[in-house]
C-alpha cells in the first residue's frame, strides 16, 4: 500500500475520534443539565409538601437520574470506541511511516539510476564534442573544411538559448530579441538557422562558441531529445570547470525539475512566474 492509502485511513480515524469526543462532550452537558433539574426539584420540596406531590417529584427525580445513567452509559461506550480507534490510529501511523520510508528509498534509488544514466550520457556527449572540436581545429589548419562546416568568419556568442519550440511564443522569442536589443550576441535558432543548414552542426557550433547557455526549462523542454542533447553539451563544458548553464524555469515546478535532473534543480534559477523579461535581461547583464 502507498502512503496515500494510509494517510486516508489516518484522516478517517482522526475524524471518527473527534466525532466521538464531541459526543462525549454533548453527553456531559446533558448530565450537568439533568443534575441541575434534580437540584431544582429538590428546592421545591419543603415541610409543607404533600405526600402525593412528594411522590410525583420523586418520580421526576428518578426520571432525571435514569437519564444521567443513560448519559454515563453512552460516555463509557464512546470512550471504549475512542480507545479502540486510538490503538488502530497508532498502528496506521506506523504503517504510514514505513510506507513513506519505502517511497523515499525508491525515489532515492530512481534518482541515483537517473544520475548514473545522465553521467554516462554526459561522458558520451563530452567525448563527441571534444572530437568535433579537434576535427574542426584540424581541418581549419589544413584548410580542408567547407564554409558549411564552420561559418566564416568565426562568430562568438554571449548566450546560446536552449528551449522547446512550444515555448517560443510564450517567452523565448521575446527574450532573444530583448537580449539582442541590449547589445548581446545571441545564438537562437530563428536568428541563426537557414534553409539547408545541418541542425546538429549549427547547434554544436553555437554550443562551442557561446559564453553561456540559457536553458528554458519547461514541461515541454524535459520531453525533447534535442534539448537534452544541447543540455548535455553544456554540462560537458561545465565539467571542465566553466560556469555555463543559466537555468530559467518556465511553467514548471521544482519537483518536475528534480525528476528530470537533480543536478539542474540544485542550480540557482530565474523563474518566469516572478521575473519579467526585463528582470531576466538585467540579471544576465550582471554576469
From Swiss-Prot:
Primary role: NAD(+) hydrolase (NADase) that cleaves NAD(+) into nicotinamide and 2' cyclic ADP-D-ribose (2'cADPR).
Domain remark in the UniProt entry: The TIR domain alone is active and produces cADPR (residues 134-258). It dimerizes in crystal structures.
Top EC class for this record: hydrolase
Record field: catalytic activity: NAD(+) = 2'cADPR + nicotinamide + H(+)
InterPro entries listed in its UniProt record: TIR_dom, Toll_tir_struct_dom_sf
Any GO BP: signal transduction
Active site, renumbered: 230
Keyword NAD belongs to the record: yes
Keyword field contains Cell membrane: no
Lineage: Bacteria, Pseudomonadati, Bacteroidota, Bacteroidia, Bacteroidales
Subunit description: Homodimer.
Protein name: 2' cyclic ADP-D-ribose synthase BtTIR
Keywords: Hydrolase, NAD
Site (Important for ADPR cyclization) location in chain: 226
SMART domains: TIR
Any GO molecular function: hydrolase activity
Domain TIR, chain residue ranges per copy: 155-287
EC number annotated for this UniProt entry: 3.2.2.-
Amino acid at each position: 500500500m502507498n502512503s496515500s492509502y494510509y494517510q486516508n485511513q489516518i484522516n478517517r480515524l482522526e475524524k471518527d475520534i473527534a466525532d466521538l469526543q464531541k459526543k462525549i462532550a454533548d453527553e456531559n452537558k446533558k448530565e450537568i443539565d439533568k443534575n441541575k433539574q434534580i437540584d431544582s426539584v429538590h428546592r421545591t420540596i419543603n415541610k409543607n409538601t404533600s405526600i402525593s406531590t412528594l411522590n410525583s417529584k420523586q418520580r421526576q427525580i428518578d426520571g432525571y437520574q435514569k437519564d444521567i445513567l443513560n448519559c454515563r452509559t453512552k460516555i463509557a461506550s464512546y470512550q471504549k470506541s475512542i480507545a479502540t480507534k486510538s490503538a488502530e490510529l497508532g498502528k496506521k501511523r506506523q504503517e504510514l511511516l514505513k510506507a513513506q520510508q519505502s517511497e523515499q528509498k525508491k525515489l532515492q534509488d530512481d534518482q541515483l539510476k537517473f544520475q548514473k544514466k545522465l553521467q554516462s550520457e554526459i561522458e558520451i556527449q563530452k567525448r563527441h564534442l571534444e572530437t568535433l572540436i579537434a576535427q574542426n581545429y584540424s581541418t581549419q589548419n589544413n584548410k580542408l573544411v567547407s564554409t558549411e562546416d564552420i561559418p566564416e568568419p568565426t562568430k562568438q556568442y554571449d548566450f546560446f538559448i536552449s528551449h522547446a519550440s512550444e515555448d517560443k511564443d510564450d517567452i523565448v522569442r521575446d527574450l532573444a530579441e530583448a537580449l539582442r536589443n541590449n547589445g548581446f550576441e545571441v545564438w537562437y535558432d530563428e536568428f541563426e538557422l537557414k534553409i539547408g543548414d545541418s541542425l546538429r552542426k549549427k547547434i554544436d557550433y553555437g554550443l562551442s562558441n557561446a559564453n553561456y547557455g540559457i536553458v528554458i526549462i519547461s514541461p515541454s523542454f524535459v520531453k525533447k531529445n534535442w534539448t537534452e542533447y544541447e543540455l548535455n553539451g553544456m554540462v560537458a563544458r561545465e565539467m571542465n570547470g566553466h560556469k555555463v548553464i543559466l537555468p530559467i524555469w518556465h511553467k514548471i515546478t521544482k519537483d518536475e525539475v528534480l525528476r528530470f535532473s537533480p543536478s539542474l534543480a540544485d542550480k540557482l534559477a530565474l523563474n518566469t512566474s516572478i521575473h519579467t523579461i526585463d528582470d531576466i535581461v538585467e540579471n544576465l547583464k550582471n554576469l
